[in-house]
């Protein structure tokens, strides 16, 4: 009788047991070094599942293979792609048909517990963190903003009798009404939020201006102190002097925090300590190299007899070697315990601790005198140090005011105010300030918060305690904010060229003048008049803006057919020039750039302004400086292009806050305070009957409406003022040309026009538009079926397999698109075309 099916299968499985066990044993050592990540289980399961399906699919036509695949010898087999084995029409097979992502490869990542299977591949910008973690019920996604109709959609709602000019006029009116309605809805939705009121409410705007002006004066005083005490004389904004630049920025921060000259001494102490640490590391490195050299010299002197046991010990297992090492280390530790620890010398360092332990074990002889006198020498040193410490207690120690600790909170809802976060964090020791960023409309107006504490606190303990607190049913999710790593960053060294430096002086002087005038920084009051003083840093600045040339000498020499003696003969390309460095101009420019950075928080070479820097953890954080000289010569075109680019990028900093014109404001619905006050009075004048009128604000009754009106203006004047302030509040928001609003949701435009031309020009697919993330649960648009390329190709940029042929060369006939996303048309005509043959108009 034959064996059962189970016994037969077991025999087949055990056929290569020895081979498999040897293979697994070799892999065990590699797996020991790696952490056991539970996140990889999904990937292994997917790999096994795909292999199983592959085996089951072709089990009829092929014999099973039972030996394991060796990943360390050869890569795993790839699955063959067939025309009939395609899931292009099935939206839940998201291996290669990702229409909205820039990658056509399979989705590597654990499947998300929510939403469409393809959505976890997309970039989840704009999706709240709770939604990405699976807690979608905790998130209020809100109703999507209504989209404005296109002209074509608007025409469908009109009657056929409306002509073209009337339709255009009505569409313009529709656009104005739509924007007005959107603006009013946005105002009503956000008018009670702190960030919105601080921007536009008349009372809050005045307070905000006073605070910003006070902080500007504080920063100005810090800069003037540095300039008067020659802190800026020896520092240049070059990447080689990054340490000196950081020292100047830290000194400015110490002065902003109210520090004194004693507190500034801590910068010198830190500099000396850094030098000492560098010297320790260098000395440890030198001793290590000397030790290696001596060992190499002593190695050939060893007899051959000593080498024989070494060769015999080689095949010892690593486990036994580890046990021997542990046994050796235990008696060494016991011998070190009774002796006291040696004091560190100037040559010792933490980095060289391994080398120190090696030297102690290798040469025990020098330790014997230290063991005898190790107890006496520390006592003598302590006795000598004790009387010196007493006078130090009386002196004031410098404070590290430039260093802080901070907590970062990523998602603060707009309804939580700064005062609430301040009250929450004030209970912890060392609290200093709170900074809130501007709300982000694309992220549901969430804000980022930075809570700054003193350097002496345990910031991790505070962060942990804040993590367990909910504010208005919102988790703050704080994290410890790291210190800035690279505070000084460099840009192109072409900025050292003299014409560029002169142009930068001109732009920086203009920018300083514009920012000072906007902030009224140098305006003082003499009696009733406002007198503007000149910024001392701009004094005699025009002397450096004028270019001096030898025009007369060049003219006389050119008429005689000679060249000036000072001009060197040009070598190489005449259009290229060497970078000329002018130290005098650079010194003037650096003072202007330090003024912009310290006073106005403007990083000139980065062409940006750091907002609310006075409330941030580091009040002078980052600065961009000039890089090293370019190794090659530069062309005139590069110089002019650099000047043009930096002028364009600085243009927004020069621009004054734009407001709408009166006509545009009236079209958008600007309100009149007096008319709104009259409407308020009319709404609060109610007729009860004949000669009976009621004021609902107080509940009093009057004989006529004029008495109610008089009563409201006399007894409820504060209500009238509130109405007028509300009108001014709305008008301030309306007239701001850069007012915040909901991001417009634009529908995806089908490819046409230029896309068709691109296809005709030889491209396989039309250029891809900006990527857009679909709302939760919304199905993706249908992909084209038979005939032609799909509407959204799997990889329009050729970054994966399938698009290689179209990028092999320009001007060639495009290869066959290996598009396995959609099934090809079975009725398509198969043809052969000779590439060397002349063009034929009638080919298929």
From Swiss-Prot:
Coiled-coil intervals: none
Basic and acidic residues: bias regions: 16-73, 277-337, 376-397
GO biological process, one term: primary miRNA processing
Gene3D superfamilies given in the database record: 3.30.70.330
Signal sequence coordinates: none
Residues covered by region (Disordered): 1-90, 277-401, 555-575, 794-825
Family matches, as InterPro entries: Nucleotide-bd_a/b_plait_sf, RBD_domain_sf, SE/Ars2, SERRATE/Ars2_C, SERRATE/Ars2_N
Compartments where located: Nucleus, Nucleoplasm; Cytoplasm
The keyword Repressor is annotated on this UniProt entry: no
Keyword set, alphabetical order: Cytoplasm, Nucleus, RNA-mediated gene silencing
Any single GO CC term annotated in Swiss-Prot or TrEMBL for this entry: cytoplasm
Acidic residues compositional bias, start-end: 349-359
GO molecular function, a single term: nucleic acid binding
Family of the protein in this entry: Belongs to the ARS2 family.
Main function: Acts as a mediator between the cap-binding complex (CBC) and the primary microRNAs (miRNAs) processing machinery during cell proliferation. Contributes to the stability and delivery of capped primary miRNA transcripts to the primary miRNA processing complex, thereby playing a role in RNA-mediated gene silencing (RNAi) by miRNAs.
Subunit relationships: Interacts ncbp1/cbp80.
Protein name: Serrate RNA effector molecule homolog B
Protein species of origin: Xenopus laevis
